[in-house]
């Protein structure tokens, strides 16, 4: 007996409620009591220890796709960390927002870093979880369409910089 049939569909891992759920809007607008002014994470470096990051996501672009905010690399323009160093496997993938990354999976002694295990050298995300958590915390604002409805999504601190640590 078949009791339920549902259409298969894939839903992108985008969040639109994080900032609202924690009350970030008054901090962003500077209307929070005692706030010296609007604040969206400028001068914060967020480290995410997870499954890596999707380098191609607009959530981690050097320029915010919604308001055009140009991120400032606190290390200095063109200076990056970890596998984004000039001789690293991720050289050329970092930018003023995504300022570095480290690979603790493929770089671990005895680890089987092969395609069959869905791992590759560097801190690229092979399953999406690290990308989702990093964008929830510090992803740029983005205009997206979800279930045919336009939405604007954002990390809690969209103007923060990010260093990704691929640990799983």
PLM regions: where:
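Acidic glycine-/aspartate-rich tracts in secreted/extracellular proteins
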Residues: 10-12, 51-55, 60, 105, ...
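Subtilisin-like peptidase catalytic core
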Residues: 100-168
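Loop/turn elements at helix/coil->beta-strand transitions in domains of secreted/extracellular proteins
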Residues: 2-4, 41-46, 93-97, 158-163
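Soluble non-cytosolic domains of exported or imported proteins
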Residues: 38-39, 43, 54, 123-131
């Amino acid at each position: 007996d078949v009791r339920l049939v549902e259409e298969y569909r894939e839903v992108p891992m985008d969040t639109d409620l994080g900032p609202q759920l924690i009350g970030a809007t008054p901090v962003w607008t500077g209307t929070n009591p005692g706030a010296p002014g609007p604040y969206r994470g400028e001068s914060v470096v967020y480290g995410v220890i997870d499954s890596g990051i999707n380098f191609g996501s607009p959530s981690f672009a050097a320029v915010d796709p919604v308001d055009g905010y140009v991120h400032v690399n606190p290390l200095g323009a063109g200076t990056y960390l970890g596998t984004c160093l000039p001789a690293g496997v991720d050289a050329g993938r970092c930018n003023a927002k995504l300022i570095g990354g480290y690979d603790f999976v493929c770089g671990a002694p005895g680890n089987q870093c092969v395609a069959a295990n869905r791992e590759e050298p560097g801190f690229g995300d092979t399953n999406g979880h690290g990308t989702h958590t990093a964008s929830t915390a510090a992803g740029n604002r983005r205009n997206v369409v979800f279930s045919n409805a336009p939405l604007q999504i954002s990390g809690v601190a969209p103007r923060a910089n990010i260093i990704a640590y691929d640990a799983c």
